[in-house]
């Protein structure tokens, strides 16, 4: 239980921290990657939600 709680805290903290504070800007050559970089902090949450979808698919055995 502690591991799941820790994972939730880490995911939420990383998503909140990185989306609320911007200290750096990508160089001009990589400006087209801005939408992908903005989405990257949310990716761990997708894995967390995938675990529930997977468990629902196997009927929470």
UniProtKB/Swiss-Prot annotation:
Transmembrane spans: 40-60
Subcellular location(s) of the protein: Plastid, Chloroplast thylakoid membrane
Propeptide: 1-24
Source taxon at top rank: Eukaryota
Any single GO BP term: photosynthesis
Pfam families with a match to the protein in the record: PsbK (PF02533)
Keywords: Chloroplast, Membrane, Photosynthesis, Photosystem II, Plastid, Reaction center, Thylakoid, Transmembrane, Transmembrane helix
One term under GO cellular component: chloroplast thylakoid membrane
Membrane-protein topology: Single-pass membrane protein
InterPro entries: PSII_PsbK (IPR003687), PSII_PsbK_sf (IPR037270)
NCBIfam families, per the entry: PRK02553.1
Protein family according to the UniProt entry: Belongs to the PsbK family.
Function: One of the components of the core complex of photosystem II (PSII). PSII is a light-driven water:plastoquinone oxidoreductase that uses light energy to abstract electrons from H(2)O, generating O(2) and a proton gradient subsequently used for ATP formation. It consists of a core antenna complex that captures photons, and an electron transfer chain that converts photonic excitation into a charge separation.
Assembly notes: PSII is composed of 1 copy each of membrane proteins PsbA, PsbB, PsbC, PsbD, PsbE, PsbF, PsbH, PsbI, PsbJ, PsbK, PsbL, PsbM, PsbT, PsbX, PsbY, PsbZ, Psb30/Ycf12, at least 3 peripheral proteins of the oxygen-evolving complex and a large number of cofactors. It forms dimeric complexes.
Record protein name field: Photosystem II reaction center protein K
Organism: Daucus carota (Wild carrot)
Lineage per the UniProt record: Eukaryota, Viridiplantae, Streptophyta, Embryophyta, Tracheophyta
